[in-house]
A protein has these predicted regions:
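Conserved catalytic-core segment of nucleotide-activated headgroup transferases in glycan assembly
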Residues: 1-49, 53
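Acidic, amphipathic alpha-helical patches
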Residues: 57-61, 102, 121
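Short alpha-helical segment that forms part of, or immediately flanks, the ligand-binding pocket
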Residues: 61, 84-89, 103-104
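A charged, aromatic-enriched C-terminal amphipathic alpha-helix characteristic of glycosyltransferases
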Residues: 116, 133-163
């Protein structure tokens, strides 16, 4: 059960590692892959936190395709989150806190979960890792959305968002 975090470590990786301590307690067969550079201590290795091997886009695509869930809390400074969009296109459910643009990238209870607190983040991750029917429901919805976003779609979303905030 591979989980992945493919964004920068300053995008609330500390929150994720704290959450992972609880997630791993509930899911001893789960692994969390994070982006380098990051100092993975023996304590984190014992929690099955591993560094991805960065490199070509093919490496990233293969890492995403071999993962079950993307865990990405988000960050207040994030205005788009390409990592979440990549996960969406590869039909990978996301568990997030919805910080920054993540609340726009995830449809709660359809393409992933937007947690309101640490407990929900842990519980949503646990559910997706262990409930095959739920995982397949999310994946099916993501498959139906695949290749539906293009430049004009994203531009219209931005215009609508700006209009709502006037």
């Amino acid at each position: 059960k591979k989980c992945i975090f493919t964004t920068k470590s300053d995008r609330n990786l500390d929150f994720l590692i704290n959450a992972w301590r609880q997630i791993y307690t509930l899911n001893k067969d789960a692994e969390l892959y994070i982006n380098p550079p990051y100092n993975v201590s023996q304590d984190l290795i014992n929690l099955k936190i591993k560094l991805r091997h960065k490199g070509s886009k093919n490496n990233l695509i293969n890492d995403l395709k071999s993962s079950k869930i993307m865990l990405v809390p988000g960050h207040k400074g994030e205005v788009f989150c390409l990592a979440a969009e990549e996960a969406r296109e590869l039909c990978l459910p996301i568990v997030t806190m919805g910080y920054g643009s993540l609340y726009e990238r995830v449809e709660h209870n359809k393409t992933g979960y937007i947690a309101r607190n640490l407990n929900e983040f842990v519980n949503y991750t646990h559910k997706l890792l262990n409930d095959k029917d739920l995982y397949l429901k999310f994946r099916s919805h993501l498959l139906s959305l695949r290749n539906t976003r293009n430049f004009s779609h994203v531009a219209n979303e931005l215009i609508n968002l700006i209009s709502q905030n006037k």
